[in-house]
Amino acid sequence: EIDLFGEQAVLCGGMAALCRTAFETLVEAGYPAEAAYLECVQQLRLTAELVEKHGIEGMRRRISPTALYGDLTRGPRVIGAGVKAIMSEILAEIRSGAFAAEWMARVAEEPGWPEEGLRRARHESLEAAGEIIRGLQGRPASGAGPGPGTAADRQMPD
C-alpha cells in the first residue's frame, strides 16, 4: 500500500504532474521552454539529493534565503488542503482494492494500454526542451526508456 501510494501521489504521478504544470505555467507566461525545463525539471535532482542527504529541514538550511522564503510561504499554497484530500482518496482506493481492480480491468480491456498511455501523456514541448538540454549536457537526447513493466524501469538512475 505504501509503495503504491508513494509512486502515485509523490514519486511518479505527483512529481510528473507538478513538473509539467510548473513548466506549462512558465512557457505560457512567455519564458523559453528550455529555461522552464532547466528550472522545473532538471534542477529537481539537486533538491532531491539535498533532501535525501540532509532531510527537508537540512535542505531548507542549505538553500538561499529567497528560496527558503518562497518554500515556506508559497509551497503551502501550491500543495494545500485540497491536495491532501485527493491524496487521502488515492490511498483509500489503494486500500480498498479499487485501484488494483481498475488497473486489472484496464489491462484486460486494452492490452496495449501502457504504451498508449505513455503516448497520450507525452508533453511534446516539455520533452523537446528536455532533449535539447540533455543533448547540450552530452546525455542521450531521448527520454525514451525500455518501456513500462520492465526490470530496467524499476532501477534508480545514477
Provide a role label for each language-model segment:
Residues E1-D3, R20, R122, P148:
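Short intrinsically disordered, low-complexity coil segments enriched in acidic
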Residues E1-L11:
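Conserved Rossmann-fold dehydrogenase catalytic segment
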Residues A9, M15, T25, A29-A36, ...:
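An accessory alpha-helical subdomain
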Residues G13-L18, A81-V83:
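Short acidic alpha-helix initiation/capping motifs at coil-to-helix transition points
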Residues E34-D158:
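NAD(P)-dependent Rossmann-like dehydrogenase/reductase catalytic/cofactor-binding core
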